[in-house]
């Protein structure tokens, strides 16, 4: 519960430019924020992704802080490949489609907020290496299955 309250406080502070600038200038805090994506609680994971996305779209400093935070996440969680946890969230059968949608929104923000073409290519290559194309195809099939269940 404390974790949720802290995320709510961070979210409130990001409602203005001063709060965004303050957080973007503190990559160590952004790294801790990213670790919340490793939570078992879907709400906490979603909140963490939303806050990281706000930082990414604000500008270069926030974007670099989020990339560093994702590298920190990889290191702390012992992942072999950067962004593996994002792929894992898309591939798991336990997560619902709404959460997977939020993960995809974060991934799109990550790719589209890159500062230059080389960085965008590198991020896309990392995501493709993790198996994102298979995950997206699987997600499309799940979406169709859910739609068909609701229609029938």
Q: What residue ranges belong to the model's regions?
A:
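Extended acidic/polar regulatory tracts at the flanks of large eukaryotic scaffold/adaptor proteins
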Residues: 1-152
């Amino acid at each position: 519960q404390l974790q949720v309250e802290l995320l709510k406080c961070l979210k409130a502070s990001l409602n203005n430019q001063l709060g965004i600038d303050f957080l973007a200038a503190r990559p160590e805090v952004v790294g801790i924020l990213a670790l919340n994506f490793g939570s078992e609680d879907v709400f906490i994971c979603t909140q963490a992704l939303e806050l990281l996305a706000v930082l990414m779209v604000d500008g270069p400093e926030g974007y670099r802080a989020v990339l560093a935070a994702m590298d920190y996440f990889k290191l702390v969680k012992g992942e072999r490949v950067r962004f593996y946890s994002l792929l894992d969230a898309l591939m798991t059968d336990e997560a619902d489609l709404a959460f997977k949608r939020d993960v995809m929104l974060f991934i799109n923000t990550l790719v589209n907020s890159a500062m230059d073409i080389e960085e965008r290519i590198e991020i896309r290559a990392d995501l493709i290496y993790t198996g994102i194309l298979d995950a997206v195809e699987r997600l499309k099939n799940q979406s169709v299955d859910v739609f068909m269940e609701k229609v029938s």
